[in-house]
């Protein structure tokens, strides 16, 4: 067989012309070790801090430690299939989660993936989980209220839109109950809610979701769940993912409320991740930047001005301010608020609601300690009618608790002291409230008005709550115009005051109290 040189050259030319030279330039590295969800990766010279890394099996990780000859990364999800020598690729993207109204009514994990079995979420947008908080110029002062529906909070420690109000207390003192009641009370008030569950039992999270569904609150709520069975990295990042979902509404001129339940477990998860990454431990074995962990998260809750919203939406939304209100929860050990994480978060937030085990066990629920609980900016946002009527309530309660402690040892008390103790008992009883029964502004106003004007003085302590319920029913059926006026205007005018007094006196005559 004789080969023709021209045929050979033609064959070679055709092969060369058909050669596909498609090449993907990716920064890659090799897994050196895998332990407890932490991977050490050699290579990845151009990786960014916080960048998503792609592991085999469609698994992603997060680059946290950038060292001279290796990268320390946390794996987001299962890591059992990752082994030494596996190839790791850079993605060139910071960790993002889906955002938007498509998430409302759904339960998602830290990465925004649905875990409620209701099918995929067709979110149109995604956003990075780590963002810089709005600057000083972009912010506006807190001046609009967030009604929690809880008498003791709305009267003594009011919360405003854009505020950070800490809920702090030992385990089993009703911290989650306060936050869930606040979410339920936002129905019809135009506030979107995000509930972030960190390190809780899956059964506990399921109970909260079921209660929100029963009260129709899931229509305007997103639940971000990082259960106790999830990895430490997922628990640590859940709060930031939830915050990004809440910021979507804030930046578009809407109002949102976010509950972090709870940041103690987030700090534990971050401590675990940091120690596994071999970062040097500090006080209570927490890393040096544990304050920054919470401050950069809570500073993102703010009320932003009209100009910020207009610039963000490129003029699509004008004349509207946006807000993200945060209710972080901290669990204390044996009432120790001077521990590392509680003191950090107290110093970052705009006030705290302190829940006490002794009060809870005594049947005073919500178990709010009126002496230590404070709202630093909420007073400006409180509704006028409640502000005018609740002035003396907090002082009365604080003085009553002090006097009650002394009265245990004193046998003969003067009339003034006895009167103050009696009033304190009645106010304490009045501020008790069952779970999942939030009150409207007019109900709170009527109760406070009755207490301030001595209508409860002749009512037995055990009859205070039945008296209150009867009064509300009486006002709703016979004085609907007055009730609607107070609810709409949020003011008790000089004309309405005698009308309310007459209505309560009318009820006293007809009721057997």
Curated annotation (Swiss-Prot):
Binding residues annotated for ATP, in chain numbering: 169-176
Required for activity, annotated site positions: 373
Membrane topology: Peripheral membrane protein
Pfam families (alphabetical): ATP-synt_ab, ATP-synt_ab_C, ATP-synt_ab_N
Catalysed conversion reaction: ATP + H2O + 4 H(+)(in) = ADP + phosphate + 5 H(+)(out)
Localization annotation: Cell inner membrane
Major subcellular site: membrane
Keywords: ATP synthesis, ATP-binding, Cell inner membrane, Cell membrane, CF(1), Hydrogen ion transport, Ion transport, Membrane, Nucleotide-binding, Translocase, Transport
Top-level class of the enzyme under EC nomenclature: translocase
CDD domains hit by this protein: ATP-synt_F1_alpha_C, ATP-synt_F1_alpha_N, F1-ATPase_alpha_CD
Annotated EC: 7.1.2.2
Single annotated GO MF: ADP binding
GO-annotated cellular components: plasma membrane; proton-transporting ATP synthase complex
Superkingdom field: Bacteria
Family membership: Belongs to the ATPase alpha/beta chains family.
SUBUNIT field: F-type ATPases have 2 components, CF(1) - the catalytic core - and CF(0) - the membrane proton channel. CF(1) has five subunits: alpha(3), beta(3), gamma(1), delta(1), epsilon(1). CF(0) has three main subunits: a(1), b(2) and c(9-12). The alpha and beta chains form an alternating ring which encloses part of the gamma chain. CF(1) is attached to CF(0) by a central stalk formed by the gamma and epsilon chains, while a peripheral stalk is formed by the delta and b chains.
Function: Produces ATP from ADP in the presence of a proton gradient across the membrane. The alpha chain is a regulatory subunit.
Name this polypeptide is given: ATP synthase subunit alpha
Organism lineage string: Bacteria, Pseudomonadati, Pseudomonadota, Betaproteobacteria, Burkholderiales
């Amino acid at each position: 067989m004789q080969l023709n040189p021209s045929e050979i050259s033609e064959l070679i030319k055709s092969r060369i012309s058909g050669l596909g030279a498609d090449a993907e330039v990716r920064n890659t590295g090799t897994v050196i070790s895998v332990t407890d969800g932490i991977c050490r990766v050699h290579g990845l010279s151009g990786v960014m801090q916080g960048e998503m890394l792609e592991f085999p099996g469609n698994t992603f990780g997060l680059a946290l430690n950038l060292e001279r000859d290796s990268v320390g990364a946390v794996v987001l999800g299962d890591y059992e299939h990752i082994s030494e020598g596996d190839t790791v690729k850079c993605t060139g993207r910071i960790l993002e989660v889906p955002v938007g109204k498509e998430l409302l009514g759904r339960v998602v994990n830290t990465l925004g993936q649905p875990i409620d079995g209701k099918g995929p979420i067709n979110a149109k947008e995604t956003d990075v989980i780590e963002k810089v908080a709005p600057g000083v110029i972009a912010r506006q002062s807190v001046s609009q209220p967030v009604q929690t529906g809880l008498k003791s909070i709305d009267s003594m420690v009011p919360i405003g839109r854009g505020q950070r109000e800490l809920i702090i207390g030992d385990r089993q003192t009703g911290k989650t109950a306060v936050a869930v009641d606040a979410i339920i009370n936002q129905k019809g008030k135009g506030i979107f809610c995000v509930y972030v569950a960190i390190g809780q039992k899956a059964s506990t999270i399921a109970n909260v979701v079921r209660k929100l569904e029963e009260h129709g609150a899931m229509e305007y709520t997103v639940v971000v769940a990082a259960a106790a069975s999830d990895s430490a990295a997922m628990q640590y990042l859940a709060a930031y993912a939830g915050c990004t979902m809440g910021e979507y509404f804030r930046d578009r001129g809407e109002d949102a409320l976010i509950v972090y339940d709870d940041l103690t477990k987030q700090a534990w998860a971050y401590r675990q991740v940091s120690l596994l990454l071999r970062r040097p431990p500090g006080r209570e074995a927490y890393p040096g930047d544990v304050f920054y962990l919470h401050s950069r998260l809570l500073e993102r809750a703010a009320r932003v001005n009209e100009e910020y919203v207009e610039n963000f939406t490129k003029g699509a939304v004008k004349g509207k301010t946006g807000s993200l209100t945060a209710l972080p929860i901290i669990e204390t050990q044996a009432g120790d608020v001077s521990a590392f994480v509680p003191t950090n978060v107290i110093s970052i937030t705009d006030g705290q609601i302190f829940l006490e085990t002794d009060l809870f066990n005594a049947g005073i629920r919500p178990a709010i300690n009126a002496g230590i609980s404070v709202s630093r900016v909420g007073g400006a946002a409180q509704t006028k009618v409640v502000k005018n009527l609740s002035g003396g309530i907090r002082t009365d309660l604080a003085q009553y608790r002090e006097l009650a402690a002394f009265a245990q040892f004193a046998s003969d008390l003067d009339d003034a002291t006895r009167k103050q103790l009696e009033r304190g008992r009645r106010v304490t009883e009045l501020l008790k409230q069952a779970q999942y029964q939030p009150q409207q502004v007019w109900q709170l106003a009527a109760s406070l008005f009755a207490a301030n004007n001595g209508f409860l003085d002749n009512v037995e302590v055990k009859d205070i709550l039945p008296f209150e319920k009867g009064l509300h029913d009486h006002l709703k059926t016979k004085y609907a115009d007055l009730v609607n006026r107070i609810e709409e205007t949020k003011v008790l005018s000089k004309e309405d005051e005698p009308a309310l007094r007459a209505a309560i006196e009318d009820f006293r005559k007809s009721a057997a109290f």
